């Protein structure tokens, strides 16, 4: 067996195969691996960005909820405050109305008392005039005078 041809033939064939593979087959494989590696790295980076954005969005949502709760609390406090003011205004108005009604009633009572006193004075003066005229018509007698005064006193 001829060692030179047997050895160099496959060796040259193998060298040509390696050169052909390195020249035409290996660059697309390396490019595909690099592209895949880049895709994976981009995917991981996108996942990290997505996670960061999700965390940021959750923080914003929590802040918005906190603000909404604070606003709701402020609105409730303002409503309670306004309610208390309205109740106090209504009470004050009711008190002033009650005072006005009481003053009006007292004034009417005073007027009625004045009218009653005036009527009483008129009646007393009328009775006094009648009594004096009857006394003058009768004879001046102490007993008759006393009886007449007692009778007039019972009329009053």
From Swiss-Prot:
UniProt keyword list: ATP synthesis, Cell inner membrane, Cell membrane, CF(0), Hydrogen ion transport, Ion transport, Membrane, Transmembrane, Transmembrane helix, Transport
Keyword Amino-acid biosynthesis: no
Cystine bridges: none
Bilayer-crossing regions: 4-26
Pfam family, one: ATP-synt_B
Chief place of localization: membrane
Superkingdom of the source species: Bacteria
This protein's GO CC annotations: plasma membrane; proton-transporting ATP synthase complex
GO molecular function ontology, one term from the record: proton-transporting ATP synthase activity, rotational mechanism
Compartments (UniProt record): Cell inner membrane
Transmembrane helix listed as a keyword: yes
Membrane topology: Single-pass membrane protein
CDD domains associated with the record: ATP-synt_Fo_b
InterPro entries per record: ATP_synth_B-like_membr_sf (IPR028987), ATP_synth_b/b'su_bac/chlpt (IPR002146), ATP_synth_F0_bsu_bac (IPR005864), ATP_synthase_B_chain (IPR050059)
Family according to the record: Belongs to the ATPase B chain family.
Role description: F(1)F(0) ATP synthase produces ATP from ADP in the presence of a proton or sodium gradient. F-type ATPases consist of two structural domains, F(1) containing the extramembraneous catalytic core and F(0) containing the membrane proton channel, linked together by a central stalk and a peripheral stalk. During catalysis, ATP synthesis in the catalytic domain of F(1) is coupled via a rotary mechanism of the central stalk subunits to proton translocation.
Subunit structure: F-type ATPases have 2 components, F(1) - the catalytic core - and F(0) - the membrane proton channel. F(1) has five subunits: alpha(3), beta(3), gamma(1), delta(1), epsilon(1). F(0) has three main subunits: a(1), b(2) and c(10-14). The alpha and beta chains form an alternating ring which encloses part of the gamma chain. F(1) is attached to F(0) by a central stalk formed by the gamma and epsilon chains, while a peripheral stalk is formed by the delta and b chains.
Protein name (database record): ATP synthase subunit b
Source organism of the structure: Halorhodospira halophila (strain DSM 244 / SL1) (Ectothiorhodospira halophila (strain DSM 244 / SL1))
């Amino acid at each position: 067996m001829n060692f030179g041809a047997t050895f160099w033939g496959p060796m040259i064939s193998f060298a040509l195969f390696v050169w052909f593979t390195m020249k035409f087959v290996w660059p697309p494989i390396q490019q595909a691996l690099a592209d895949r590696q880049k895709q994976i790295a981009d995917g991981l980076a996108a996942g990290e960005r997505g996670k960061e954005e999700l965390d940021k969005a959750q923080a914003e949502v929590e802040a918005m909820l906190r603000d909404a709760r604070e606003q709701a609390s402020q609105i409730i406090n303002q409503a309670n405050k306004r309610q208390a003011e309205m109740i106090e205004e209504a009470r004050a108005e009711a008190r002033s109305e009650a005072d006005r009604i009481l003053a009006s009633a007292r004034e009417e009572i005073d007027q009625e008392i004045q009218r009653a006193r005036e009527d009483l004075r008129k009646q007393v003066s009328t009775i006094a005039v009648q009594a004096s005229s009857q006394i003058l018509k009768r004879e001046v007698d102490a007993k008759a005078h006393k009886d007449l005064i007692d009778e007039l006193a019972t009329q009053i």
